């Protein structure tokens, strides 16, 4: 009964607030206490009992009352942090205020007139004490709120265990507390593993929800190419003003990386016991990636209003980014810490892949997108971590889940963002030689995927999945084709033995991309052919010995190369090719690609359910903006190429002058030529046809085709295995052109990808927070909410 009464009283207070036309004095504690003092409302109750329309009504009609509600709620949190929340009543007040602010803040952010409200100073309202500390009291409300949340996240007996049992109830005790002794979980920089405590986890989660809501002001600003628009909430929270920055960063990272959803591995245990840890881990992962939203391409220090200022620190060489969370992340260096992080992320990413004999017997986590963003941030901000990942085969424990997600999401339009981040991570990894070398490890783990069965290496898995994405993904994935093929180009010089299945897939892609209707239907389509020819050239020149399957496939499909060499350039042929083009082509025909049987236990990639919510994404830069070319020297080191030599040495990627927007738009096969905006000319075809890198392949065909034909005639052979045996023992030493230098296209950070990551990350957070629906139905500007 008590609970029902408290909900009723709370609802009455809300109605009073919305109906009062006169401002309620901040000193009227009897009125304001109704919102937090005597209620035991859950966060779900608060969302149900405080409707969006009523918050907006108060904001428009009695703004001073909404302002006072926020002041008073923050004041209560500050008092709780100062006093240490010793009584149950104090703890309840803190939780109630936290829930109320989580509900109200998005409606403050959505109104531009209110946006500066939390950054204004409130005399006397910033701190609980009535002392002479005018400077303290003049803190902006946002700063008081953020510091209170930080203090409360390390509050003994509320969010952490009390190490001292002598009950010193003094405020000094709270301020002298060394929160580094209270890190939530063992791992990086902390060896002690505290006893799990359900209540503490729940309280942490509520406070992290509020913190995430504070940070979410970014959702209410439209995407802008200037990534200088720093989030003032994140900037202050991750500054030296927050004395808990280091222990909180460590707590969040360790909580995520130490989590094991399977636990003791007892089947169905997740059905018997609720896992209270997972919601905390999700919240920790989301807060962590938002605090790390720092553009590594810029180094200016923005102020609260977004303008950049020079400081005395700028002249000196700064120790690292001003964002302490980014700084701490970039300075992790111990091997055991890297091992802990990598194992933790790999374990969680692999969790949805766990297949047992008992369906649904293991708990499946849902926050793999947040984990991929976290992994990206780790590799981007800490190059030592990236090299550690690539130093051993452990990188394959990240690769396989990413390929699983890419394959699974390829038909689902609501998961385009997941496809992009998976491909971006692989592009980043492929810029390092070690990644290509690691791919030669045999692939023996059989993750059920909707792809043809093959026996081979992780390189085979990568190429077979990429082929599946290109030939049977939905149309919105076409801008990714360049990235997918760039990854294959980057690793190709190191691939020792591709399987026959994979060799056929690569040749099928070349066959599809080199049809005249495809080549002539958009101004950039020929780049895909250049990429594939570069793959073949790299393998022939640098890994010929082990790749008899690919050489055999090239010989069998030699007509494709001859057609390319003799591509028609006269206007009637161009017209005829475009006429032949089907009216609404699929992304690519799958005819000619032997699909074979799919893996046992796999299910086809399914499109999104109609009505599924998704968030829009800003466009990604073209491959020319995403990467820079480097040449591999003889000693294996990389040398960055000057733009001019890039231009001449490889015509197979768009020139810097070409806008990436046109690059994306023109790739739309369905309407490229129909739109009439662009049509191919003889001069245009001649401009790139002469640069097709066919010399190596033509020389190979010139030498090997007569030999293979002779063997077949002499021995009456029709058996592939005999021909393959001949090719395995053959050599082209001295017969091929001089090997070309290996070109690697390394990912480079830029403001375009920084903005893409920001919109993607907040879109994921928006859609994942449905209980309670913190931002649902508010006027977000960073992205659009769409239904599939």
Curated annotation (Swiss-Prot):
GO cellular component, one term: cytoplasmic side of Golgi membrane
Membrane topology note: Lipid-anchor
Region of interest (Disordered), ranges: 297-316, 571-680
Predominant localisation class: cytoplasm
Gene Ontology biological process terms, A to Z: insulin processing; response to glucose; secretory granule maturation; vacuole fusion, non-autophagic
Localization of this protein: Cytoplasm; Golgi apparatus membrane
Keywords linked to the UniProt accession: Cytoplasm, Golgi apparatus, Lipoprotein, Membrane, Myristate, Phosphoprotein
Listed Polar residues bias regions: 590-600, 643-680
Low complexity: compositionally biased ranges: 297-313
Signal peptide bounds: none
Residues recorded with modification Phosphoserine: 653, 670
Family stated for the protein in its record: Belongs to the hid-1 family.
Protein name: Protein HID1
Species annotation: Mus musculus (Mouse)
Gene name of the record: Hid1
């Amino acid at each position: 009964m008590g609970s029902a009464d408290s909900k009723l009283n709370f609802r009455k207070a809300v109605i009073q607030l919305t109906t009062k036309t006169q401002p309620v004095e901040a000193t009227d504690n009897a009125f304001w206490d109704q919102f937090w003092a005597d209620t035991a409302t859950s966060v779900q109750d608060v969302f149900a009992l405080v409707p969006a329309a009523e918050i907006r009504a108060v904001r428009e009609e009695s703004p001073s009352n909404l302002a006072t509600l926020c002041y008073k709620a923050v004041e209560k949190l500050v008092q709780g942090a100062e006093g240490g929340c010793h009584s149950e009543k104090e703890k309840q007040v803190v939780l109630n205020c936290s829930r109320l602010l989580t509900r109200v803040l998005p409606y403050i952010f959505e109104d531009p007139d209110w946006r500066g409200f939390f950054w204004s100073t409130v005399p006397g309202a910033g701190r609980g004490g009535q002392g002479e500390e005018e400077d303290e009291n003049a803190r902006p409300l946002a700063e008081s709120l953020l510091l209170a949340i930080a203090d409360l996240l390390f509050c003994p007996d509320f969010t952490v265990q009390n190490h001292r049992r002598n009950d010193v109830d003094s405020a000094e005790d709270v301020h002298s507390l060394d929160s580094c002794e209270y890190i939530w979980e063992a791992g990086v920089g902390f060896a002690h593993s505290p006893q799990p405590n359900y209540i503490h986890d729940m309280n942490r989660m509520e406070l992290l929800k509020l913190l995430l809501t504070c940070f979410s002001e970014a959702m209410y600003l439209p995407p802008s190419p200037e990534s200088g628009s720093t989030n003032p909430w994140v900037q202050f929270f991750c500054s030296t003003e927050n004395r808990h920055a280091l222990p909180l960063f460590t707590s969040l990272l360790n909580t995520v990386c130490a989590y094991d959803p399977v636990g003791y591995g007892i089947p169905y245990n997740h059905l018997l016991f609720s896992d209270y840890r997972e919601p905390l881990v999700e919240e920790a992962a989301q807060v962590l990636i938002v605090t790390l939203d720092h553009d590594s391409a810029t180094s200016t220090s923005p102020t609260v209003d977004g303008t950049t200022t020079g400081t005395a620190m700028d002249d000196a060489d700064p120790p690292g980014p001003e964002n302490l969370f980014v700084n701490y992340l970039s300075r992790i260096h111990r091997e055991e810490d890297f091992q802990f992080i990598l194992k933790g992320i790999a374990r969680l990413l692999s969790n949805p892949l766990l297949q047992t004999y008992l369906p649904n017997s293991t708990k499946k986590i849902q926050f793999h997108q947040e984990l991929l963003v976290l992994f990206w941030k780790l590799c981007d901000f800490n190059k030592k971590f990236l090299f550690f990942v690539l130093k051993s085969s452990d990188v394959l424990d990240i690769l396989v889940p990413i390929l699983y997600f890419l394959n699974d999401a390829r038909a689902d339009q609501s998961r385009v963002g997941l496809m992009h981040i998976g491909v971006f991570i692989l592009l980043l990894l492929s810029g390092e030689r070690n990644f290509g070398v690691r791919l030669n490890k045999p692939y023996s783990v059989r993750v059920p995927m909707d792809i043809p069965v093959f026996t081979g290496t992780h390189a085979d898995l990568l190429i077979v999945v990429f082929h599946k994405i290109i030939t049977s993904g939905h149309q919105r994935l076409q801008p990714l084709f360049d990235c997918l093929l760039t990854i294959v180009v980057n690793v190709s010089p190191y691939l020792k033995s591709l399987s026959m299945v994979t060799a056929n897939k690569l040749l099928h892609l070349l066959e599809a991309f080199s049809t005249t209707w495809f080549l002539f239907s958009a101004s950039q389509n020929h780049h895909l052919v250049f990429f594939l020819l570069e793959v073949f050239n790299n393998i022939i020149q640098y890994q010929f010995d082990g790749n008899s399957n690919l050489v055999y496939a090239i010989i069998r499909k030699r007509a494709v190369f001859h057609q390319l060499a003799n591509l028609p350039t006269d206007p009637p042929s161009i017209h005829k090719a475009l006429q032949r083009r089907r009216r609404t082509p699929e992304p690519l025909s799958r005819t000619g690609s032997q699909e074979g049987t799919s893996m046992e236990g796999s299910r086809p990639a399914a499109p999104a359910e109609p009505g599924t919510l998704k968030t829009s994404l800003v466009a990604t830069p073209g491959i020319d903006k995403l990467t820079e070319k480097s040449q591999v020297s003889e000693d294996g080191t990389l040398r960055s190429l000057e733009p001019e030599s890039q231009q001449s040495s490889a015509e197979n990627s768009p020139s810097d002058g070409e806008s990436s927007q046109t690059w994306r738009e023109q790739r739309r096969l369905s309407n490229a030529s129909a739109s009439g905006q662009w049509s191919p000319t003889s001069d245009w075809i001649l401009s790139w046809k002469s640069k097709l890198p066919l010399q190596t392949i033509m020389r190979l065909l010139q030498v090997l085709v007569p030999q293979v034909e002779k063997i077949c005639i002499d021995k009456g052979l029709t058996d592939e295995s005999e021909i393959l045996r001949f090719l395995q023992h053959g050599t082209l030493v001295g017969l091929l052109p001089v090997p070309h230098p290996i070109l690697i296209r390394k990912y480079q950070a830029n403001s375009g990808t920084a903005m893409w990551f920001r919109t993607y990350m907040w879109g994921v957070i928006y859609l994942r927070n449905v209980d309670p629906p913190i931002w649902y139905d508010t006027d977000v500007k960073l992205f659009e909410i769409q239904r599939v």
